Every structure is written in structure tokens, then in C-alpha cells.
Curated annotation (Swiss-Prot):
Part of the 50S ribosomal subunit. Contacts protein L20. The keyword Ribosomal protein applies. One of its GO terms (cellular component) is ribosome. It comes from the Bacteria. It comes from Thermotoga sp. (strain RQ2). This is Large ribosomal subunit protein bL21.
């Protein structure tokens, strides 16, 4: 069984027991329970439920594991014949969530 949930303006495919990495959820601390009620799609034992726009009564329950930063993404701006370049780096915050159950 799997579902597609919408959070932080993006859609993610989730399964029970798997870990979901999303944009940082500032309102939750590690160990808190998080509930996604914007379920767009559910597939269970060959049965398919598609929401218009969301599936009625469906929710996904997970537990926040950690807030951390992803690997550094480096960008380089090089100017030919000027002997100059600019290097920048960015590390995006993310939240790791363990999916505990999908309820209909």
C-alpha cells in the first residue's frame, strides 16, 4: 500500500515503514507525531483511490526523526578573460519523517 501526499507545495510518494525527506517542518520537533491530511492518491491491494483534489477521510501518520542539513551544493560563476570567479555554497534544511501508517 502506498499513498501520494502533498506537503510544502510538493507531492511525495510514501509507504509504511519508509523514511520521507521533506522541506524543513519548523513546527515539529524530533519525536513529534505529524499527520498529513492532504492525501492525493492511495493504492491498497489493487484498489485505487484518486482525490478530487484530496481523498476524503484519508491521512498519513508519521514520526519526525530529525532536522538536518543536506549535502552542500556548490555553484561557480566564472568570467573568462577577467581572471575572476565566484564560488558559492548552499546547504538546504530538511526533515526526516518515518511513515508509521496510512489510514483510510
Amino acid at each position: 500500500m502506498y499513498a501520494i501526499v502533498e506537503t510544502a507545495g510538493r507531492q511525495y510518494r510514501v509507504e509504511e515503514g519508509k523514511i520521507l525527506y521533506t522541506e524543513r517542518q519548523k513546527d515539529y520537533s524530533p519525536g513529534d507525531e505529524i499527520v498529513f491530511d492532504r492525501v492525493v492518491f492511495v493504492r491498497k491491494d489493487g484498489e485505487v483511490l484518486v482525490g478530487k483534489p484530496y481523498v476524503e477521510g484519508a491521512k498519513v501518520v508519521g514520526k519526525v526523526l530529525e532536522h538536518a542539513k543536506a549535502r552542500k551544493v556548490k555553484t561557480v560563476k566564472y568570467r573568462p578573460r577577467k581572471n575572476s570567479k565566484v564560488e558559492k555554497g548552499h546547504r538546504q534544511w530538511y526533515t526526516a519523517i518515518k511513515i508509521e501508517k496510512i489510514e483510510l
